[in-house]
Amino acid sequence: IVLDTMNFWMDIMLDELKDTLKLIDVLTINDEEARQLSGEYSLVKAARKILKMGPKFLVVKKGEHGALLFNQQDDVFFAPALPLEEVFDPTGAGDSFAGGFIGFLASSGDISFDNMKRAIIYGSAMASFTVEKFGTERLLDLSQEEIDARINQFVDLVQFDISIADKA
């Protein structure tokens, strides 16, 4: 069970929201909502506090700066946002991220930490398409080939080799 909540519910139904957090697998919120819910400025401290409220995983969306994934074992994963030359409208990007993320998890049936990382990349890819036009209009004519190519762009962006042992 994935919950994508917002500050509105934190403002008017905080106790009910906290009760709900005990029943879910994944909470997705943005960085400001993480700070509001936890009372912590540091996102690492915020994540630890929120995870103690019940969810097994926490995804913190940071807009054009990517997303963070935390679990109750103190594992952390960071995925950058894809640098785009043309950004027309960020409206709906967070919802597209959540839809891509949840859709990937639902299609795989796997909620392991490693698969959550893949889901974050998939969600980030969907969000990157959304900002290319107004609203969610860009998603209407999207092909699987375009999605696969965008995901490969993410992989190319973050994949590198660093060998510290060779620097002696």
Tell where the protein language model's regions lie, with residue ranges.
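Conserved phosphate-binding/catalytic region of the ribokinase-like
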Residues: 44-168
